[in-house]
């Protein structure tokens, strides 16, 4: 157990005995806050969780959920989150080879975490405002030039390439070369599970994306367009077809959009997406 410089908090790696108090903290999240964390804890406090405990009130004020490539943040107090960042930064390796982590959560909490975490050898690769957008109704007309369907075995090569490109920023490496066997297995499993979509523009490959179902709706993830297809008109046409397919499975479609990507914002706005939760994504190297 680490006791921070601020004596009102204690920080430690969480175990199952802490689960109920973590759930109590997460119960204060708004509808679209801490979705990944709430989904993860539904089956128990597995994986790596780290928390800041306010001793005077006997409750957690901030928690971090750490996966292979992400650090998800939620809390009710910036000081508590700064303490988490300080302790994790103190114990973090100065260099981590080719691997990278992405810190994600509400803007103020990511800032507080980084204020505590920042250590020599940890650099910010990118710092992005990432908006969670919701779609419940398609507002634009469909165009027959675009088509989207669930990927099949015959699409493996396309999925392998496009999904590999989509994962470069998240993982900090090109899994098509540095983790080829694992990436092949992942693509095959996701295709078999019916969780990959492929899209075309006039018959030419234009899009690959993944989706997963959550209590809040269907999440569209790792949505990738090759450079030649990153035009607002094309992205609008593909996203409209994606929505047509997925809204047949659930009433709500969710998608994270880079607030600085004007072309993508314009495309999804026309389809009918609107911002429901702003967030911040900081990628480290």
Regions from the PLM with identified roles:
Residues 106, 159, 220:
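Residue-level signal for inorganic ion chemistry
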Residues 30-49, 175-196:
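Active-site rim helix/loop that mediates acceptor-substrate recognition in acyltransferases
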């Amino acid at each position: 157990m680490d006791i921070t410089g601020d004596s009102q908090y204690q920080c430690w790696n969480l175990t199952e005995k802490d689960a109920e108090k973590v759930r109590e903290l997460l119960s204060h999240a708004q509808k679209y806050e801490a979705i990944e964390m709430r989904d993860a804890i539904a089956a128990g406090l597995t994986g790596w969780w780290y928390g800041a405990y306010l001793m005077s009130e006997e409750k957690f004020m901030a928690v971090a959920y750490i996966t292979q490539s992400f650090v998800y943040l939620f809390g009710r107090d910036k000081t508590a989150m700064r303490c988490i960042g300080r302790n994790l930064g103190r114990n973090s390796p100065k260099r981590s080879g080719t691997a990278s982590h992405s810190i994600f959560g509400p803007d103020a909490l990511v800032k507080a975490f980084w204020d505590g975490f920042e250590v020599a050898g940890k650099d910010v690769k990118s710092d992005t405002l990432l908006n969670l957008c919701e779609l419940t109704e398609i507002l634009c007309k469909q165009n027959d030039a675009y088509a989207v369907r669930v990927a099949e075995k015959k699409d493996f090569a396309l999925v392998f390439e496009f999904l590999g490109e989509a994962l470069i920023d998240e993982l900090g490496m090109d899994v098509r070369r540095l983790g080829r066997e694992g990436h092949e297995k992942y693509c095959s499993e996701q295709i078999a599970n019916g969780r990959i979509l492929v899209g075309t523009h006039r018959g030419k490959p234009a899009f690959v994306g993944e989706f997963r179902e959550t209590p809040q709706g269907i999440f569209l993830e790792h949505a990738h367009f090759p450079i030649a297809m990153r035009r607002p008109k094309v992205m609008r046409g593909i996203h409209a077809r994606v929505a047509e397919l997925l809204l047949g499975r659930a009433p709500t479609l969710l998608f994270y959009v880079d607030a600085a990507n004007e072309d993508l914002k314009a495309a999804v706005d026309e389809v009918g997406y609107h911002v429901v939760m702003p967030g911040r994504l900081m990628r480290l190297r």
